[in-house]
Amino acid sequence: MTNIRIKLLTVQVITSLASGENIDFEKVEKLVKDAGFVIGDIKALIAAIHFIIFNSVKNDVDESTLSTELQQLGLPKEHCDSISRAFREHKEKLRSIFHNNTLKLPSLHSLDWRVDFILSSNTIQEVNSPSVQLNFKVKNHSNNEITNHPFEISAKKFNVLYYELKGAKLLMETVNQ
């Protein structure tokens, strides 16, 4: 295969990674049809380039290191340079896409609360005591869905929760400094 075809194949794989869609197999077949590859070889070639590009972006490899590593694996220098150039041209775009698609934990969207004076309840043994009604609204960043998590606790348990959360916040602030 020529250097130009290797670069075009690498660009196809990068485009597939960036868009999140499947690779256009017809374009890839046109690129490699003269090389006499069978379907299995084409799939292996795509998988290898995908692995190289994905892990190079993930591990923040620079262009020269990528080229050197590929040469050490036995690839011709011209092919290594073609892959490295295509990688360099699209690296920042892929990094931003990977960053946006990383695991994001749900966050607290809002908190509603109220204190009720309970005359009778299934969950609290003490009647005629205050009870705290909490409703956490949690935002899931992967699908932007907000879910409600309501619950009821006694005033004593709320005080314990409050002071433990204050202590945890203080510990987190000291670690961040």
Curated annotation (Swiss-Prot):
GO terms for biological process: signal transduction. It comes from the Eukaryota. CDD domains: Commd4 (cd04752). Signal peptide: none annotated. InterPro entries: COMM, COMMD4, COMMD4/6/7/8. Residues 107-176 form the COMM domain. Scaffold protein in the commander complex that is essential for endosomal recycling of transmembrane cargos; the commander complex is composed of the CCC subcomplex and the retriever subcomplex. Component of the commander complex consisting of the CCC subcomplex and the retriever subcomplex. Component of the CCC subcomplex. Belongs to the COMM domain-containing protein 4 family. PANTHER family: COMM DOMAIN-CONTAINING PROTEIN 4, COMM DOMAIN-CONTAINING PROTEIN 4-8 FAMILY MEMBER. This is COMM domain-containing protein 4. The gene is commd4.
